[in-house]
Amino acid sequence: MTSTDPSQASADRYVVIGNPVAHSRSPSIHAAFARQTGEAVHYDRLEAPLDGFADTVRRFFADGGYGCNVTVPFKLEAYDLADRLTERAEAAGAVNTLWIEEGLIHGDNTDGIGLVRDIQDNLDTLIEGKRVLLLGAGGAAMGAMLPLIECRPSRIVVANRTASRASDMLEAFVEAADQYGVELWGGGLDALEGLSEDEAVDVVINASSSSLQGEVPPVPEFLLGEGVLAYDMMYGAEPTVFLQFAARCGARVSDGLGMLVEQAAEAFYIWRGVRPRTAPVLAELRAALQAERKV
């Protein structure tokens, strides 16, 4: 376990659990939140064995831990482990935030709300009334759907390599979409070629694994033109290949670093009841990434 602030021996203990987890930026983010708010928080990394996630979590709480963030590959296991789930977690089918309340393990998913706050607050792009294209139908896309719907876009199009998976995912959100007046459409990535320019979108979100594989999703160039925000949930020292392609097409681009900070801020608020300011923390992280890029 790696400590972010060894001087805080009496602080409330939190961790991020994953495998691997040494690369996680969560400790530095939460340490910044703690300094900013004056909260006595001690946040570490904790690597769980691939076959020992539940035992690791239970031991952490039994030893006096207050809460934990969950990263790959354990978000589905965290969903199963939680005794109580928030509406967001149930909709996402995955959990990235755990805490103990009245002796029970509670689970939430803050990824989607982190995404929409980054887009709306940090990137100054209102989602209400807009047309959104979501690339991918895996766990990242599932976690984004309900928070996106709650922002009341006019339409959400989900495009996935396997068309049936996109359709299946949308089935789970028909009721919510009806409640918020959002039109849903889903299909294969190849179906995007059949869209007319009248069906152009305002925001394109890459929630697929393509950037991890160094691949560009087959998105028609006219969907990434001037005035469009192209957003990739991935982030790194260099722009992803998707963002490079989108920028060449004329779109405004952003990676997912702000989403990382915003989902962490939501977890901090759940645990502490205090909402930290994210802008200075995001600026600090962005500067660190730029420094890495120059090395």
Curated annotation (Swiss-Prot):
Picking any one GO molecular function of the record gives: shikimate 3-dehydrogenase (NADP+) activity
Binding positions for NADP(+)?
E87, G136, A137, G138, G139, A140, N160, R161, T162, A163, S164, R165, M233, G256
Pathway field of the UniProt record reads:
Metabolic intermediate biosynthesis; chorismate biosynthesis; chorismate from D-erythrose 4-phosphate and phosphoenolpyruvate: step 4/7
Q: Which residues bind shikimate?
A: S24, R25, S26, T71, N96, D111, Y235
Gene Ontology biological process terms, A to Z: amino acid biosynthetic process; aromatic amino acid family biosynthetic process; chorismate biosynthetic process; shikimate metabolic process
In short, the EC number is 1.1.1.25
> Can you list the GO cellular component terms from the UniProt entry?
cytosol
Function field: Involved in the biosynthesis of the chorismate, which leads to the biosynthesis of aromatic amino acids. Catalyzes the reversible NADPH linked reduction of 3-dehydroshikimate (DHSA) to yield shikimate (SA).
Q: Which family does the UniProt entry place this protein in?
A: Belongs to the shikimate dehydrogenase family.
Protein name per UniProt: Shikimate dehydrogenase (NADP(+))
Q: Which gene encodes it?
A: aroE
